């Protein structure tokens, strides 16, 4: 496995600030015009110890999420951080325990986000199961997340859909292997499956980043969870795809910093650089600026 921070490629690393007692994690970076920003999550637990909840009721200790929006300067510093207002979202049955791992993307000249709305009540109360994690699609207006629609499926847990904007149409990678693409129908506020044909297949993995334009095609990041002794190790793959959903190339597995738990939720491209955003152990939120050309050479050759 390759480690990007030990590749010898020059990079800049921006750690987004801790806002409350919640640990920061899993940022999603976006570049819109001349602005760069990143959403990221605060969580009330520690992965470094079993049942390590440090905020909330001891009787009903469940994961709880806060979300923030950071403005990033041209000098690659954090200019400001605000809460993403979600109290109205938490009034929803499917989001009682917050929104997890928002992915920011631009569509039709506006900023949108999709994330996993969490409801742990059925597990706590041992009642008939409700959907525990539901993908919620909405628009980010300043620092307010306004839900548009939930995407209801027959799965108990939905997460990590990958937004993919092609021209003015919005798609999501629902599953990498086999490749399942969903198209959003705005008039009906629902998604439909799109037929795809690709000679090259993606590996067995899960979604991570959005898809963004790169060198005439699109680039994105997948994550893989590998069971180890009493733990799970996360690894990533970069991949290229065409606007017709043809998989063009898949990189070797890599880690950002060599940590066991890393999770990439964002990628952006500007002036020949990749901006890769990821969490470390659900306790740090990082944006990495690194040469796109040298990164591609390191991961694909």
Which functions belong to the PLM regions below?
Residues 1-301:
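Beta-propeller domains
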């Amino acid at each position: 496995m390759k480690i990007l921070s030990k590749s010898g490629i020059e990079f800049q690393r921006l750690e987004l600030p801790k806002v409350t007692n919640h640990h920061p994690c899993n940022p999603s970076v976006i570049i819109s015009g001349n602005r760069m920003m990143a959403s990221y999550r605060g969580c009330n637990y520690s992965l470094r110890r079993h049942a390590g909840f440090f905020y909330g009721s001891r009787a009903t200790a469940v994961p709880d999420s806060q979300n923030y929006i950071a403005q990033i300067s041209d000098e690659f510093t954090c200019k400001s951080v605000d809460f993403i207002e979600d109290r109205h979202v938490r009034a929803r049955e499917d989001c009682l325990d917050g929104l997890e791992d928002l992915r920011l993307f631009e569509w039709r000249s506006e900023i949108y986000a999709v994330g996993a709305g969490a409801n742990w009540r059925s597990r706590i109360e041992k009642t008939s199961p409700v959907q525990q994690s539901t993908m919620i699609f909405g628009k980010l207006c300043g620092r307010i997340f306004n839900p548009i629609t939930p995407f209801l499926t027959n799965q108990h847990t939905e997460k990590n859909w990958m937004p993919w904007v092609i021209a003015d149409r919005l798609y999501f990678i629902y599953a990498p292997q086999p490749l399942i693409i969903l198209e959003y129908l705005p008039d009906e506020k629902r998604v439909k499956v799109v037929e795809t044909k690709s000679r090259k297949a993606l590996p067995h993995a899960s979604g991570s980043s959005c898809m963004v334009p790169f060198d005439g095609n699109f680039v994105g990041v997948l994550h893989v969870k590998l069971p180890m002794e009493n733990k799970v190790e996360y690894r990533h793959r970069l991949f290229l795809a065409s606007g017709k959903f043809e998989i063009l190339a898949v990189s070797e597995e890599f880690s950002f910093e060599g940590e066991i738990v890393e999770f990439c939720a964002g990628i952006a491209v500007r002036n020949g650089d990749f901006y890769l955003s990821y969490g470390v152990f659900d306790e740090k939120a990082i944006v990495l600026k690194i040469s796109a050309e040298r990164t591609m050479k390191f991961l694909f050759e």
